[in-house]
Swiss-Prot record:
This is NADH-ubiquinone oxidoreductase chain 3. It comes from Salmo trutta (Brown trout). Core subunit of the mitochondrial membrane respiratory chain NADH dehydrogenase (Complex I) that is believed to belong to the minimal assembly required for catalysis. Complex I functions in the transfer of electrons from NADH to the respiratory chain. The immediate electron acceptor for the enzyme is believed to be ubiquinone. Pfam families: Oxidored_q4. Belongs to the complex I subunit 3 family. Its EC number is 7.1.1.2. InterPro entries: NADH_UbQ/plastoQ_OxRdtase_su3, NDAH_ubi_oxred_su3_sf. It comes from the Eukaryota. GO terms for molecular function: NADH dehydrogenase (ubiquinone) activity. Keywords: Electron transport, Membrane, Mitochondrion, NAD, Respiratory chain, Translocase, Transmembrane, Transmembrane helix, Transport, Ubiquinone. It is an enzyme of class 7 (translocase). The chain crosses the membrane at residues 3-23, 56-76, 85-105.
């Protein structure tokens, strides 16, 4: 077995074990203290279960997508040193086109409008 296969097997096994333990441990002893909200050692002043803004979530996801896009396209100037620079340019153009189409769709659907 080569090194990469061993690392992948260890990663998958460790992930499965940790996911199983994380779902299993909280169910052992649920009590009122574990289920109550915690605000820096003080009793909560209001409702601790406030609704979360879906628009804020969508804008945060868009920010993460475009931040990831920058991270993926940052090494693009060094892509011309590869064996097929045209293929590198084509893939980066495809990524940019896909993200641009997604942004246009989100804009036309009104997902970027903060106030209605």
């Amino acid at each position: 077995m080569n090194l990469i296969t061993t690392i992948i097997a260890i990663t998958i096994t460790l992930s499965a074990v940790l996911a199983t333990v994380s779902f299993w441990l909280p169910q052992i002893t649920p009590d009122a203290e574990k289920l109550s909200p915690y605000e820096c050692g003080f009793d909560p002043l209001g409702s601790a279960r406030l609704p979360f803004s879906l628009r804020f979530f969508l804008i945060a996801i868009l920010f993460l997508l475009f931040d990831l896009e920058i991270a993926l396209l940052l090494p693009l100037p060094w892509g011309d040193q590869l064996a097929t620079p045209a293929l590198t340019l084509a893939w980066s153009a495809a990524v940019l086109a896909l993200l641009t189409l997604g942004l246009i769709y989100e804009w036309t659907q009104g997902g970027l409008e903060w106030a209605e």
